[in-house]
Design a protein with these regions (language model features):
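Subset of outer-membrane beta-barrel
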Residues: 1-313
C-alpha cells in the first residue's frame, strides 16, 4: 500500500491497533490522487467497515477492508480485500493486550493494451502492430495473504495517555506464482512496528505523536508525525474539535494535514510535497488526500481515547 494509508486507518497495517475501549460501529473512506507529483496518475482508495463489540471477558472488532492502488500509463493495479479481526484482553488499570488477524487476498495486474515499446516507433511513426516487448504469461495474479498483529495499549502514565505499541507481519501464502514469463516477482514479508502516544496539555488540548517503521527485506520506511488537537466544545455528548498535523516520511515526503471532528464525524484533508525534489519543485508538486470517518452508536469517555483519521500517515 501507498504510505498515505497509514494516516487513513492504522488498522491497514495492524488490525489489533483499533481502540479497545470503543463499542459500536465504524465506517471509513479515504481517497488520494497524486496528480501533480509525477507525470502519470497515482490513485489510492480505501474503504473500511467494522463492528466493535464486548463479550464477558474481552472486547473484539470484526469487519471488512478494501484497498486499491492504480498507477502509471499501464494502469498497474494492486487490490486488497481483507477481513480484519481482533480481540482485546483487559489487564490491570484499563490496559489491554490485543491480538489481530486479517486473512484476505491481494491481486496485482497491468493493462497491456496501454503499453508502448521502442519497436512501435519506426522512422518517427508510431504503429501499434510492431510489438516485441515483454511477454506476460498472465496480466494479473491473485495471492492469498494474512496480516498477523500484536498490540499493547497502556492507558496512562503521567500526562501520557493511550500509549500503543504494535507489531505486525504481512504474510503472502503463495508468493511463487509466475507473472512475467521466466520471472517470479518478489513478494516478501512486510513487517510493521507502530508507536502512538497522546500527551495531555490541558483539558481541551493534547498532542498525538506517531511513529511507524516498515521493513521489507532490504527496503524500509520510517514515518514520524505529530498532531495538535484542540477541543472546541463538549456539550450534551457532542464534541467539536480541530487539529493540525505535520508528518515526515524519511527522505521522501512532508505532509501537512488539518482535520475537523464533529460528534461522530471526522474529516481530514492533507497535501504532501516530495521533500527530495524541493530544489526543483514548484508549488504544484504534491498530492491531495481526503479522509472521512463515521462512528455510530458510540460513547466516548474522553477524546484522547478516540482514534481519528489523522493519526497515522
Amino acid at each position: 500500500l501507498h504510505f498515505s494509508a497509514f494516516h487513513f486507518l492504522n488498522t491497514n497495517f495492524n488490525s489489533a491497533s483499533s481502540n479497545p475501549n470503543f463499542i459500536g460501529y465504524t465506517a471509513a473512506a479515504g481517497y488520494r490522487n497524486q496528480y501533480r507529483t509525477v507525470p502519470v496518475n497515482y490513485n489510492t482508495a480505501s474503504i473500511n467497515v467494522n463492528k466493535h463489540g464486548k463479550l464477558k471477558f474481552l472486547n473484539y472488532n470484526l469487519g471488512i477492508q478494501f484497498n486499491s492502488d492504480k498507477a502509471g500509463d499501464v494502469s498497474y493495479s494492486r487490490t486488497e480485500f481483507f477481513i480484519p479481526a481482533a480481540i482485546h484482553y483487559k489487564l490491570l488499570s484499563n490496559n489491554f493486550i490485543s491480538f489481530g488477524l486479517s486473512p484476505g487476498i491481494k491481486s496485482f495486474s497491468v493493462d497491456q493494451t496501454k503499453m508502448t515499446f521502442d519497436e512501435q516507433y519506426q522512422n518517427g511513426t508510431y504503429s501499434n502492430v510492431n510489438i516485441n516487448g515483454e511477454n506476460f504469461s498472465r496480466l494479473s495474479v491473485y495471492i492469498p495473504s494474512s496480516l498477523i498483529s500484536l498490540n499493547y495499549t497502556l492507558s496512562k502514565i503521567g500526562k501520557f495517555r493511550n500509549i500503543q505499541l504494535g507489531i505486525s507481519r504481512m504474510i503472502l501464502l503463495d508468493k511463487n506464482k509466475e507473472w512475467v514469463k521466466n520471472s517470479i516477482p518478489s513478494f516478501n514479508r512486510l513487517n510493521n512496528f507502530l508507536l502512538s502516544i497522546d500527551y495531555i496539555l490541558n483539558e481541551n488540548n493534547f498532542l498525538r505523536i506517531n511513529s511507524l517503521f516498515q521493513k521489507q527485506k532490504v527496503q524500509s520506511n520510517l514515518i514520524n508525525g505529530i498532531s495538535y488537537i484542540h477541543v472546541l466544545n463538549r456539550n450534551q455528548g457532542i464534541t467539536k474539535a480541530i487539529g493540525i498535523g505535520l508528518f515526515y516520511r524519511q527522505k521522501d515526503a512532508i505532509i501537512i494535514q488539518p482535520s475537523f471532528m464533529f460528534d461522530n464525524y471526522e474529516l481530514a484533508v492533507s497535501y504532501d510535497v516530495n521533500s527530495n525534489k524541493f530544489k526543483n519543485a514548484t508549488n504544484l508538486r504534491g498530492a491531495f488526500e481526503i479522509c472521512i470517518r463515521y462512528k455510530l452508536n458510540t460513547f466516548f469517555e474522553r477524546l484522547p481515547l478516540k482514534k481519528s483519521c489523522p493519526v497515522f500517515i
